[in-house]
């Protein structure tokens, strides 16, 4: 009482249980076809009218297969997943490590900010100082991370730094070139319609 939540009352005597249980059910196929939808991602409209981009299993698996090999996601700890699943760049951090046998570190909704990511990266000593397989960020997030992460903590924090979602300037990667020279830096481009990335 007093709340604005609607209630639904079901009287068990009114349900037709015998008739419902006698219905023949058709089992749906649990194996998707290549052209079946894997997900729909809504674009920002930067390449045209805002719309939902329909991503097929074929396109998704093609990208993930390529990414697991190119980013060598089986080397290291896996990847922190710090972005929203509504952002297609998260697909790389989430699925690529899992499909190559490494792990993902899911950040809580309270811990999605750059401060929490900084803390996780700075605390890698508890993982035996092993490197993350990959870290995917926008260049703006990289600039924020670079400003807060100590230079000595940049070294070995990840094997591959993947940047995308906006224009990348050389000044953004300069601290990483200087303090983490063994970290591979990749500028990935791709409109949502092409399944995350189509050019590096």
Identify what each model region corresponds to.
Residues 12, 17-200:
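Motif- and composition-driven signal specific to adenylation
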């Amino acid at each position: 009482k007093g709340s604005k939540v609607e209630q639904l009352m079901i009287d068990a005597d009114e349900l037709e249980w015998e008739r419902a249980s006698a219905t023949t059910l058709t089992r749906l196929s649990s194996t998707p076809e290549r052209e079946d939808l894997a997900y729909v991602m809504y674009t920002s409209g930067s390449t045209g009218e805002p719309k939902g981009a329909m991503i097929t299993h074929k396109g998704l698996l093609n990208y993930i297969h390529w990414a697991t090999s190119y980013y060598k996601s089986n080397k290291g700890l896996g990847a922190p997943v710090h972005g929203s699943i509504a952002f297609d760049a998260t697909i790389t951090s989430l699925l690529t490590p899992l499909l190559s046998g490494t792990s993902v570190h899911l950040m809580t909704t309270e811990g999605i900010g750059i401060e929490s990511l900084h803390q996780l990266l700075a605390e890698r000593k508890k993982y035996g100082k092993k490197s993350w397989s990959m870290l995917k960020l926008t260049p703006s997030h990289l600039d924020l991370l670079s400003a807060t992460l100590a230079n000595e903590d940049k070294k070995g924090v990840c094997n591959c730094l993947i940047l995308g979602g906006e224009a990348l300037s050389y000044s953004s990667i300069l601290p990483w070139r200087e303090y983490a020279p063994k970290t591979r830096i990749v500028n990935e481009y791709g409109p949502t319609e092409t399944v995350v990335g189509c050019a590096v």
